[in-house]
């Protein structure tokens, strides 16, 4: 029987966007393994999630042109990011507030037609990487780098973040990470976005709701804590003793186990492969080697295997992404899935309004205040 507490295993909606079954993840009918084996680009996957079919060459070209046309953010938005970057705010709070501001500055934000919603979706998808890269550089005292319309989604983000053109391997790694995190059925942030969409609120409010939900440590932030752990282990010096100490203290080891997958997370192996390829023969190899030792120890001690968060920490670090903004990268990818669910909810909408089971006291009588 499904659990009421946390709604585990309860079915809340029908969807054609993604499915998790028999420990496999599929996007609109395409197994994630098939997309990975064929090196599907993130733009293709965004199109797939929003349209429920893979694009033709012409459709993909037109879709990419729309995205690239909308990469840039206004001076007003950049100024708002600058102000926030000086306040030592949580990175997810900055993203949440800036996405909300995108809605404020879009004079057509309140339009609800299919065409208007699609245009708003394109703008959100295209501008969020620029917002993140701008924030990441400003908080380090660096000047923002303008996006390049001749670069694809993954390459453009890494260029804006690091100030140099990424290698083909780096582009592949970024694309893979984005595709693997793009969508994951009815997780907490996606459900929150659908609840908001069911009220017929605007898409900026729906995405802001999702970002606020992802900010919570029980949903987002796991790979950030994985890399913090790897740093601690490097200083500690011994993987086995470190893990045993944590386990004895009943502390959770981040990057292991999953709420839905009972055996292996089907996304994990692709990020493990990318972590190995990116670090091979470089100064970053220590992070991959530490990760492998942790993986082996956790298998021996707890019979647990890594999830998607574990090796993504090393991948992101090698790509020049600071661990404090790892969850922003999660959001940059997952916004594609959020938008797909928002659009699906609005096409066949019914207000999401569940009931609660009251467990408090009953039949109490009012007592005047002077007698209490």
UniProtKB/Swiss-Prot annotation:
The keyword Disulfide bond is annotated on this UniProt entry: no
Active site positions: 258, 309
GO molecular function: citrate (Si)-synthase activity
Enzyme Commission identifier(s): 2.3.3.16
GO cellular component: cytosol
PROSITE patterns for the chain: CITRATE_SYNTHASE
Catalytic activity: oxaloacetate + acetyl-CoA + H2O = citrate + CoA + H(+)
Pfam family, one: Citrate_synt
Pathway the protein acts in: Carbohydrate metabolism; tricarboxylic acid cycle; isocitrate from oxaloacetate: step 1/2
GO biological process terms held by the UniProt record: carbohydrate metabolic process; tricarboxylic acid cycle
UniProt keyword annotations, A-Z: Transferase, Tricarboxylic acid cycle
Top-tier EC class: transferase
Additional observations: Citrate synthase is found in nearly all cells capable of oxidative metabolism.
Family: Belongs to the citrate synthase family.
Protein name per Swiss-Prot or TrEMBL: Citrate synthase
Source organism per UniProt: Streptococcus mutans serotype c (strain ATCC 700610 / UA159)
Gene: citZ
């Amino acid at each position: 029987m499904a659990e009421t507490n946390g709604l585990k295993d309860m079915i809340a909606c029908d969807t054609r966007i993604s499915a998790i079954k028999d420990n496999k993840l599929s996007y609109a009918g395409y197994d994630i393994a098939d997309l990975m084996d064929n090196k599907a680009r993130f733009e293709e996957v965004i199109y797939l999630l929003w349209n429920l079919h893979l694009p033709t060459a012409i459709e993909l070209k037109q879709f990419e042109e729309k995205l690239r046309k909308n990469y840039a953010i206004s001076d007003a938005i950049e100024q708002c990011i600058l102000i926030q970057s000086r306040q030592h705010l949580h990175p997810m709070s900055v993203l949440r507030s800036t996405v909300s501001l995108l809605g404020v500055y879009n004079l057509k934000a309140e339009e609800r037609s299919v065409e208007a919603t699609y245009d708003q979706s394109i703008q959100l998808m295209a501008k969020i990487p620029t917002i993140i890269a701008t924030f990441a550089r400003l908080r380090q005292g660096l000047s923002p780098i303008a996006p390049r319309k001749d670069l694809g989604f993954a390459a453009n983000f890494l260029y804006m973040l690091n100030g140099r053109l990424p290698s083909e391997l780096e582009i592949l790694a970024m694309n893979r990470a984005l595709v693997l995190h793009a969508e994951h059925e009815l997780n907490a942030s996606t459900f929150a976005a659908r609840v908001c969409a069911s009220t017929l609120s605007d898409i900026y409010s729906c995405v802001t709701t999702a970002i606020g939900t992802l900010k919570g440590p029980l949903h987002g932030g796991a790979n950030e804590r994985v890399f913090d752990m790897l740093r601690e282990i490097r200083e500690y010096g011994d993987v086995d003793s470190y893990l045993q100490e944590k386990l004895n203290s009943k502390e959770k080891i981040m990057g292991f186990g999953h709420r839905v997958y009972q055996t292996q997370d089907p996304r994990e192996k692709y990020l493990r492969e990318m972590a190995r390829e990116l670090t091979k023969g470089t100064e970053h190899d220590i992070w991959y080697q530490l990760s492998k030792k942790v993986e082996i120890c956790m298998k021996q001690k707890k019979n647990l295997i890594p999830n998607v968060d574990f090796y993504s920490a090393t991948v992101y670090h090698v790509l020049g992404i600071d661990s404090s903004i790892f969850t922003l990268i999660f959001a940059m990818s997952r916004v594609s899935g959020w938008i797909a669910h928002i659009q699906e909810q609005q096409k066949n909408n019914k207000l999401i309004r569940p009931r609660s089971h009251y467990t408090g006291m009953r039949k109490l009588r009012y007592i005047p205040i002077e007698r209490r």
